[in-house]
Amino acid sequence: MSELSESGSYNSYNSLSAGSPLPLQEIFNGAETKCQSHYLQSRINTNYEQVKQQLKESAEKKNSSKIYSSLQHLTYYKVEKDLLETILRIIDITDDKKTLRLAYYFLGEISQFKHLINNSTEIKNITTIFNKEMQHKDISRKVVSLKTTASVAPNDVLIDANILDVISGILRKVGEDPDKTQKKKGFFTRATTDLGRERSLLQYSCFVACRNRYKNNPSLFMPIVEGIKCVDPVGARHAVSLTLNYALENPSTVAATTKRFIPLLKANKGKEAVYLVDPFARRNFIKLCGHLAATPSPIGNVITMENKDFFQSLCQSVMDAHLSVAFYAINVLSRFSWPTLESAHIDAIQFDSELPHFESLAFQTSLIVGICNKMRIGFNTYSIGAYSNYSMQHGHHHLHHYHQGGSGTVGGSVPSSSSSSSSSSNITTSALSSGSSSNSSLSSQQLLLVQQQQQQLLHQQSNPFLHLACKLISVLSQSYVKYSYPKDSTTQQPIIGDWSFDEKQYQHQSVYPYHHNLSPFTGLPNPISNNNNSSNNTKDQSTTTTTSTTSSSSNSIHPFSSLTQLILNLLNISPSISIRIQALKALVWLCPSNLDQSKLYLETFRSQLRDPYHPTHLFKELFLELYKRIIATPILSPMILELVYDWIDIIPSKCDTSLVCEIWKTIVEFGKVFANEKLLASIFKILDRIVHPDFRVLAMEIQKDIIKFLGEYSNQITFEQPSRFEQCKSRSGSNQQQHLSNMSLNSIIQRLQQYSIFSPWQIRLESIDSLAKIAFQSSTVVKVHIYNFLTLLPNESHGWTTVKSNTSIIVNTLDQLLTCRAKWLPLFKSSDLSQNQIKDLKNDHTNLCLQIGLFFDQLSFDYLPLGIESKKYLGSK
């Protein structure tokens, strides 16, 4: 690429050619004036300053051809404010439409410098040119002048008054025109003559000018609201948007004014109901209705008599023939509460030539049913292309399959989402099967026909629609699930439910190898799984009383269950990862709140885990949605624990252990014994799994994160409290027999001790840290046990220097803790402490908290290392 000539150099700037790259900062510094086209730079010998000078000279000489050529060259540069006078002069002297088009384009570009236009001469010139243009006979010049001037003119009282006067004159209603020039009815709606068409264009320009300059001007309120009936489609779109701006500030006034425009409202039959041709205008009107319908009432956020008509308009808009408009209405409806949606309906719709964009509806139907039907229509229309796209990507395989007499389906089964989808996909099948029945191989003509049909189907694919459809199904299903799931009568939180469904799955496995017949949390015999109504001390009474409620709610039919197969088909036919993610999110909320009925979804999610081509972020999105699901419906936690195991076992390289730990933390926070049993069983199952040699490094990193989790949450999982077994007579383990009262914690400690001896040094280091965290948060007998273990820990292995150093710190801290505990416990129980003793107690408490706090990300503010007895003396701390 050639450099610019010497006469056309960039001064301090170099060329932006691809062959001579510049430093990034230098490019940014020259961005305001440099040429924006590398191709132009290589073809012309002028720069921005030269083009600007040529334009000024041509305007002074009124040379039309040079003005036009200079404006053409200027299109490749970013203009500056100093061109304002030149552009205004060109508009004043020329009548050539091509030149005017470019001049107004650059005048609009200068609008970004409107805050710098403060010279009285510049303001006067803008006003003069505007007034002259508005008197011109050419309607197009009036339109573009009004739109552009409203953007570029600075905030000046005289300019505002001038523009408002022009807008008011154009939008003035019938009877308000002092010159009586407009006496026809339908000022906004009739445009059968040239005068009417010109009027509609001017109205359009007024609405655009108002959006650019006067969004909420009180004097223009009524003309703008009446402008919803503007015959110009785009003008009506802008009028609706302006009305929405008014509604944000004064919804009650706008609601009373615009209710008469609602289409399909019985009260508006034969009156002023608007026919919005433009789909974007209808979407804006739906947004307006949604805002007015959702306006809070004095009695709460419910649908009242004042806003029910707007809500009903949203329901009727679901039957819009344009799918984008219908789905926009569904999107707005999804923001309302589930009881409101569940009780809503769509009134019968008869074909009306004035409202052809609404589909006919013979009978009144439920809103949810109408939404499901519209979803099916959308999938029937747009998911065919996805099937075609998938088929084209696997073209040779499918052609060979058809030639051998195969069924011609993806994955071995015909997508059963709809009859139209099947029939459309069978076009290719029938053509190929007819060829295979008559000949042993497909002819070139048949192959060409198949490719043409696939290309036609490909044009019907709409990834944005499929993405939006899955997202709406997910949002609506989430609203239903959160509302219908049983809540606790006192806390109004989702109940934990009964997880005994898969008890047999774990009955043959020994999570706690030394106590097969004992409950790991109580040390008592395990209760019979079938006797759920018997007295069980390990389950809270609230859980047993709500089990029947959970079952009855879980067995109810999901209102969007009919769409499940459509979503499942997307996982088989859509090659788009974003659509697969949205489909999986929808399936998460379509899953029934019942462990037995969720098996299909469990296997579906497992099959996605086995797909080697899925990226990591797909699984993160899936498990993040599952994390939200167990918060809303804790009953599904066992299913999600199984999926977590598969995630770690099948694809450890794509596993996010931080998200896994958040899921486990949520289950711990349920605070139920049986929930913690299931969680601990799942964790031990992960730790005991057989690891493939190729994944040992990854497995070690995952194991470290799990061990860290156990160190932080073992006390919550096993309900171990520091206040248990306060009497401690020696460190020799005189109370060791009391370990059996908390077998789950004993099992965790045994595993961590094993890892501390026989594992690589990284695992040993993490295990010892976890043992320390457990000791600091546990009773004295546990502290003594871990202290004795760490003091006797062997030290002959690779990497022991680091481990030994860390262990030494932990042992010293535990030694101080136990020494202080033995010192203060007799004093706590004998008599009240003196002021000096309280001062010493506070010092010991502070020192221990500082040392122990090094092992935790954030130590609890109410942590008492010296026991619960010290609380009354530390209250004034």
Curated annotation (Swiss-Prot):
Protein name per UniProt: TSET complex member tstB
Residue ranges with Low complexity bias: 412-437, 529-556
Organism expressing this protein natively: Dictyostelium discoideum
Oligomeric and partner information: Component of the TSET complex, a heterohexamer composed of tstA, tstB, tstC, tstD, tstE and tstF, which may act in plasma membrane turnover. tstA, tstB, tstC and tstD are likely to be the core complex members with tstE and tstF acting as associated scaffold proteins.
Highest taxon in the source lineage: Eukaryota
Disordered: annotated span: 398-437, 522-557
Stored SUPFAM superfamilies: ARM repeat
Signal peptide as annotated in the record: none
InterPro entries to which the protein is assigned, alphabetical: ARM-type_fold (IPR016024), TSET_member_tstB (IPR053296)
Disulfide bonds: none
